[in-house]
C-alpha cells in the first residue's frame, strides 16, 4: 500500500518521499529512474494543484486496455468513485516514463454519500450497466427475476411464427362436435369433450391416441376439469358429474348427482379441495371431494340465480364470477365456499353498468341501487335487488360473500341487451375475458375487463370493480353454439375462435402484459396471428400449460394442434 501524502488527512510531510519500487522482481527494481527532475514539495497548508494531464502518455507494457481512472471507477469503494479528473490525470502522468513519481493523494472518504448520487448516471461502462441491471431487477423485470416468465415470453414470440400448415389433426371426427379441450397441469395429456357422450385422451406431444372413454355420460359432454395431474372431472347434459383417474380409466371413480338440468362447467378450489359446478338449472353446487366415496360426495347448494351461463373462480379463489344470458355479471367478493347463500342472505354491494369512462348512470332509491340499462334486464334486477341486506348499508363494511351486480359494457351494444356466453379469468387474476353476443345474434364481441383495485365497500360507489380495457368484434357464425376462448399461461395472449379457425390476440403488437399497456380508454385488441385449418365452425380452443402448443376443436369433430416448426 502506498503511504499517505504529506497533505492527506493522516499524512506525514517526511514520510513517503518516494514510492516503493514496482513489483515484479529484480528486473522491475533495476528500472532506471525518470530523467525528469523531482518537483519541490509544496509548503504545509498550501493548496497543491495537480499538473495538467500529459497528452499521449503511453500505457505500461502488458497493461490492461482501460485507463487507471476507469479501473478506479469500476473497482474502488463507493466513496472513492469521486476522484477528480485532475487526480486521474496525475496518475497517468506518474505512470508515464517521462513523468516523475508523485505522492498519491488520499481520497476524501467523507464524500462517499455525495458520490452515490451519481453512481448510475455519472459513470459509463460496467458501472452504468450494473446499476441499470439492479434497477430492472428491483422493478421485477429482466432475465434473472422470474425464469418461467421469460420462458413464456419466448413462447409468446414463437406463437407468432405458427402457420396453419404446421397444424396436426387428431382423429376425432366420428365422435361428434368438440365442445371442450383441457390439458393436464403437466401438459402430458389432452382431453377432448365430445358431443356423442365420449371423452378422448391424446398425447399432445406425439399426437397419439391414448384412450376413448366410451359412454362416459349419457348425453353431450360439456366440460372437463383436472383436479391434479391424475384426477379429472367431466360434466354433461345428463345432469351428472363424473370423476376419473388417469391410472384407472376403465371405470369412474364416482358419479355425482345433484343438478336438475344441463351441467355446463366445473371449477376447483385447490385450497379447500372443494369442487364447484354450475348448470342451466341456475344452481352453483359445492362438492366435498375430501369425503368422496363410490356413491358420490357430500354436496350443498351454494348459490342460485336465473339465466346462469358460466361460473368461474379467480386463481386465488377469493372471488366467484357468474355470467348470465340476460347480460349480467355477478361477482361474489370475499368468497367463503363453506357458507350457503340462500336468497336474501347475501349483501348486495351495488348494481351498476360498467363503462370505460366516467359517465356512469345509476339511480338509487331507498331499497338500493337499480341498473340503468336495457329494459329486458329489469325483471332479473328486481328479483335480485328486493333482497338487499341491510348489513351492506354500513359504510366501510365488505362482508363475506358480498354480491356485486354489473352490466358489462359491450361496444355497439349500449342500447341493446347482450348474452355473456363465455367467461374466462386472467391467470394472475388481473382481468376477466368475456365472449358476448347480442340478443338478436347479429354481433359477437370479445371483451377484456380489468379488475379495479380494492373491493367495493358501499352499496353505491362511483367506481365499479371492472373496467373495459380491450375489445374486438368476432365473426358472427355458428349461432346458438357457445365459443370457448382462453388466455395463454402467462396472460399475454388470447386465443379466440373465429369462424373456421382461431385468432391469437394481444394487448399490443409486442404482446406485453396487461399491466404494462393499460390504456386510458378502451382500445381494440391486436391480431397477432390468424390460423384457419378447419372446415367447420371452431367452438373451443386451449393453450398448453407447458409447451408452445395450441389446440382447437370444431363443430364437425376435428381437433387441430398448432405448434412452430424448427
Curated annotation (Swiss-Prot):
GO cellular component, one term: Cul4-RING E3 ubiquitin ligase complex
Keywords from the UniProt entry: Methylation, Phosphoprotein, Repeat, Ubl conjugation pathway, WD repeat
Repeat (WD) residue spans along the chain: 173-212, 216-254, 258-297, 303-342, 415-455, 477-515, 533-566
Residues bearing the modification Phosphoserine: 50, 57, 67, 96, 99-100, 356
Sequence ranges of Low complexity compositional bias: 87-100, 354-374
Organism superkingdom: Eukaryota
InterPro entries associated with the record: DCA10, WD40/YVTN_repeat-like_dom_sf, WD40_repeat_dom_sf, WD40_rpt
Quaternary structure note: Interacts with DDB1.
Protein name: DDB1- and CUL4-associated factor 10
Organism: Mus musculus
Amino acid at each position: 500500500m502506498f503511504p499517505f501524502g504529506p497533505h492527506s488527512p493522516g499524512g506525514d510531510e517526511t514520510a513517503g518521499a518516494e514510492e516503493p519500487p514496482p513489483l515484479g522482481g529484480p528486473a522491475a527494481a533495476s528500472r532506471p529512474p525518470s530523467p525528469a527532475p523531482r518537483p519541490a514539495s509544496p509548503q504545509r497548508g498550501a493548496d497543491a494543484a495537480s499538473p495538467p494531464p500529459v497528452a499521449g502518455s503511453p500505457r505500461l507494457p502488458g497493461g490492461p486496455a482501460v485507463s487507471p481512472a476507469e479501473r478506479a471507477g469500476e473497482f474502488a469503494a463507493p466513496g472513492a468513485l469521486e476522484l477528480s479528473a485532475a487526480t486521474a490525470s496525475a496518475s497517468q502522468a506518474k505512470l508515464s516514463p517521462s513523468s516523475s513519481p508523485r505522492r498519491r493523494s488520499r481520497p476524501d472518504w467523507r464524500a462517499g454519500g455525495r458520490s452515490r448520487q451519481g453512481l448510475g448516471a455519472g459513470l459509463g461502462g460496467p458501472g452504468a450497466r450494473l446499476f441499470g441491471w439492479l434497477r430492472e431487477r428491483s422493478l421485477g423485470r429482466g432475465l434473472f427475476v422470474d425464469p418461467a416468465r421469460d420462458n413464456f415470453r419466448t413462447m409468446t414470440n414463437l406463437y407468432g411464427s405458427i402457420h396453419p400448415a404446421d397444424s396436426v389433426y387428431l382423429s376425432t371426427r366420428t365422435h361428434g362436435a368438440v365442445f371442450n379441450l383441457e390439458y393436464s397441469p403437466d401438459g402430458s395429456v389432452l382431453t377432448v369433450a365430445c358431443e356423442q357422450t365420449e371423452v378422448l385422451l391424446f398425447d399432445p406431444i406425439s399426437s397419439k391416441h391414448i384412450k376413448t372413454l366410451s359412454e362416459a355420460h349419457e348425453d353431450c359432454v360439456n366440460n372437463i376439469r383436472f383436479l391434479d395431474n391424475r384426477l379429472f372431472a367431466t360434466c354433461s347434459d345428463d345432469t351428472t358429474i363424473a370423476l376419473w383417474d388417469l391410472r384407472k380409466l376403465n371405470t369412474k371413480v364416482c358419479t355425482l348427482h345433484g343438478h336438475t338440468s344441463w351441467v355446463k362447467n366445473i371449477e376447483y378450489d385447490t385450497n379447500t379441495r372443494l369442487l364447484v359446478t354450475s348448470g342451466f338449472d341456475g344452481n352453483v353446487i359445492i362438492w366435498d371431494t375430501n369425503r368422496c366415496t363410490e356413491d358420490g360426495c357430500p354436496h350443498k347448494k351454494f348459490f342460485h340465480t336465473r339465466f346462469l351461463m358460466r361460473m368461474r373462480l379467480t386463481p386465488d379463489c377469493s372471488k366467484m364470477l357468474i355470467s348470465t344470458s340476460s347480460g349480467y355479471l355477478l361477482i361474489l367478493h370475499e368468497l367463503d365456499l363453506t357458507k350457503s347463500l340462500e336468497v336474501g342472505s347475501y349483501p348486495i354491494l351495488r348494481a351498476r353498468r360498467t363503462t370505460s369512462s366516467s359517465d356512469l348512470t345509476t339511480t338509487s332509491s331507498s331499497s338500493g341501487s337499480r341498473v340503468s340499462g336495457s329494459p329486458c334486464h329489469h325483471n332479473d334486477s328486481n328479483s335480485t335487488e328486493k333482497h338487499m341486506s341491510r348489513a351492506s348499508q354500513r359504510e366501510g363494511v365488505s362482508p363475506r360473500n358480498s354480491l356485486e351486480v354489473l352490466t358489462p359494457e359491450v361496444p355497439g351494444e349500449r342500447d341493446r341487451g347482450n348474452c355473456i356466453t363465455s367467461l374466462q379469468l386472467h391467470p394472475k387474476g388481473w382481468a376477466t375475458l368475456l365472449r358476448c353476443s347480442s340478443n338478436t345474434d347479429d354481433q359477437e364481441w370479445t371483451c377484456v375487463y380489468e379488475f379495479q383495485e380494492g373491493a367495493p365497500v358501499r352499496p353505491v360507489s362511483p367506481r365499479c370493480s371492472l373496467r373495459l380495457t380491450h375489445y374486438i368484434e368476432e365473426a358472427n357464425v355458428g349461432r346458438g353454439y357457445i365459443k370457448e376462448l382462453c388466455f395463454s399461461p402467462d396472460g399475454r395472449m388470447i386465443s379466440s375462435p373465429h369462424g373456421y379457425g382461431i385468432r391469437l390476440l394481444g394487448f399490443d403488437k409486442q404482446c406485453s402484459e396487461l399491466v404494462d399497456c393499460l390504456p386510458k380508454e378502451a382500445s381494440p385488441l391486436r391480431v397477432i396471428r390468424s390460423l384457419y385449418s378447419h372446415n367447420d365452425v371452431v367452438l373451443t380452443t386451449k393453450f398448453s400449460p407447458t409447451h408452445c402448443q395450441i389446440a382447437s376443436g370444431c363443430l364437425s369433430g376435428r381437433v387441430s394442434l398448432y405448434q412452430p416448426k424448427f
